[in-house]
Amino acid sequence: DGPERLVAAALDHGASRIGLFKPDAGGGVRELTEGDSLDSYPAWKPGERRVFVYQTCGIARHHRTNEWQGLGPASIQKVDMETGEMEAVAEDASFDFLCPSFAPDGTLYYLKRPYEPFHRPSVWRFLLDIVLFPFRLLRALLAFLNVFSMMFSGKPLQTAGTPPRRDGPDPKAVFLHGRWISMEKQMRDAAVDEMTDLVPKNWELVARQRDGTTTVIANNVMSYTIGRDGTIYYSNGKGVFAQSSAAAKPERVSARKLVMCIAEVG
């Protein structure tokens, strides 16, 4: 019947679906998943006919406006297209399981991190905002005057505690796997030639064997990929590392910072 490709397709109302794409059959996409959720990162399972895994998380919406309120915990599900059966591979209300990918030998890799519930306004936070409002207003005024001074004199009003100038990207935050990661403090505290970890230690790269046993490959992982020969490549924000196997020692292959996506080409 020709080659089959798995795709993740976005919908108008903010959800996304896993679809089946056949290039030799007209190019249409047949949706394989449903529900008010974000479905992404589909991957065929090696050695099994028409079986794939994917990442999914439910969408919480406002009961009147239908606007997004947040996302539920991300899990990894397995689908057998021959039988129509679905099975949870990695699912826990306290964790996100992200970016599933298979090695050639059938080992499943994914990222695991603690789940952070979406924001719900609290009375205590509202009262705290009222108390801190004068201080925040003063800080905003000082920041405005500092920018004004830089524009006309080239010199800041504040010099104490100014971070050293560094080359390369210097964002305040990055949006990574559905969550904003603030890097202002890490950048400020880091020395000129080094950078603190950009993601928490509990962001783990996990390997799951066919028998269900799991092994933590690395911590502080923000992105990864598995090569055709089974080599593991991952980034922790300070560089890109390679491991020939789960038990091997990682080797730094690039000093590029803030690598948010890795892919093997060719």
Predicted regions and their residues:
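A short loop-to-beta-strand structural motif that recurs across blades of beta-propeller domains
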Residues: 17-19, 75-77, 199, 204-206, ...
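Residue position within the beta-strands of beta-propeller blades
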Residues: 5-10, 51-56, 107-113, 232-235
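Multi-bladed beta-propeller domains
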Residues: 1, 20-43, 68-98, 129-141, ...
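Residue-level signal for WD-repeat beta-propeller blades
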Residues: 12, 36, 45-46, 70, ...
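Beta-strand-rich domains and repeat architectures in extracellular enzymes and scaffolds
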Residues: 1, 181-201, 217-226, 260
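Short, conserved, GDST-rich strand-edge loop motifs in beta-rich repeat architectures
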Residues: 54-71, 113-200
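Residue-level detector of Asp-centered blade-edge/turn motifs that repeat once per structural unit
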Residues: 2, 46-48, 103-105, 227-228, ...
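Repeat-solenoid scaffold signature
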Residues: 86-102, 106-121
